[in-house]
């Protein structure tokens, strides 16, 4: 693998870039701040995120990725170009780039990813399915005949796959993930407490307070501030773990059902491997309190969290460039699609 080759986890909420041997070299929010009067980009990443909810009307914060795929091609190209240029100098040889994508991505959606990465200066582009990247980045050897199951819960999608001999045996992708927890918590707080809160407050509640009820020893409380829907004035309320059970379980059950369906379709020998090896959770959503307990109960197997759930997809994506000949499915040289070599 060349020194400047990179792997990109093109996430709905965060873009992470890694290089094998160096680890994560960039971790930035997937957001662009745009001056709509001039149609010009002001900031990207952390600086753009700091503007969300605190800007004049003519400054718009754009999240150009939705549910794991590109929804705004121009802004995604801008993000990737700026971030890639941060990690390698313009005088260096153009990098080979591997990008992870949802397992159920369509041809049109994957073409959009490739076009954006080539516009950023890549000389060759490879696409790798997220569950495969997550397994590699978690230190799992998927090239041997031993069934492993990955549940990767990102910002926009949850990818579930059974892997063996370098490829996918069974897989599915559901559009239930971290952002959806934020949205449901925001709506639930609005309905239960008659208070309007922002997306960042909802995310903080998810990380610090939310929990599946199967984890009986967890009970936290957090004071939040927002705007009263009754008076229109600033107000503060305390939200407890039990207050959030309803939205948390509604979404967790959808992930559990999807995982159950994948297991039901898994060949018996591989199902036995999974019973022995357990299931590994990856992605930022894997850190939800009580989720391992709930999924263990639902799937009747041990469920554990990857040693580095947030970064493992990017790390595995970077690793894939040196393992391409050992990956049977889910790893594709996508450069020819757009006539580039």
Across the structure, where does each feature detected by a protein language model lie?
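Nucleotide/phosphate-binding catalytic cleft detector across ATP-hydrolyzing
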Residues: 1-153, 161-279, 286-341
């Amino acid at each position: 693998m060349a020194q400047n080759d990179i792997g990109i986890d093109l996430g709905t909420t965060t873009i992470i870039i890694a290089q094998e041997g160096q680890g994560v070299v960039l971790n930035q929010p997937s957001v662009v701040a745009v001056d709509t009067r001039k149609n010009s980009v002001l900031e990207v990443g952390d600086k753009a995120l700091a503007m969300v909810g605190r800007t004049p009307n003519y400054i718009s914060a754009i999240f150009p990725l939705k549910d794991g795929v590109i929804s705004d091609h121009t802004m995604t190209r801008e993000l990737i170009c700026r971030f890639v240029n941060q990690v390698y100098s313009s005088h260096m040889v153009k990098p080979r780039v591997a990008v992870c994508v949802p397992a159920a991505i369509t041809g049109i959606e994957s073409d959009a990813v490739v076009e954006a990465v080539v516009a950023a200066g890549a000389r060759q582009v490879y696409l790798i399915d997220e569950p495969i990247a997550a397994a590699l980045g978690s230190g799992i050897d998927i090239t041997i005949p031993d069934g492993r199951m990955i549940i990767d819960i990102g910002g926009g999608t949850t990818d579930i796959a059974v892997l063996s001999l370098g490829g996918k045996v069974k897989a599915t992708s559901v559009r239930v993930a971290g952002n959806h927890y934020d949205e449901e918590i925001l709506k639930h707080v609005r309905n239960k407490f008659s208070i309007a809160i922002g997306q960042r407050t909802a995310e903080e509640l998810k990380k610090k307070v939310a929990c599946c009820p199967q984890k009986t020893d967890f009970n936290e409380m957090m004071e939040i501030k927002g705007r009263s829907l009754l008076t229109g004035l600033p107000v503060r309320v305390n939200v407890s773990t039990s207050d959030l059970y309803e939205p948390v379980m509604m979404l967790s059950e959808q992930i559990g059902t999807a995982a159950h369906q994948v297991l039901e379709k898994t060949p018996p020998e591989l199902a036995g491997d999974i019973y022995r090896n357990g299931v590994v959770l990856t992605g930022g959503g894997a850190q939800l309190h009580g989720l391992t307990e709930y999924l263990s109960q639902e799937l009747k197997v041990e469920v554990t969290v990857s040693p580095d759930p947030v970064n493992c997809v990017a790390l595995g994506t970077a690793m894939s460039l040196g393992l391409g000949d050992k990956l049977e499915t889910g790893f594709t040289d996508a450069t020819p699609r757009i006539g580039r070599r």
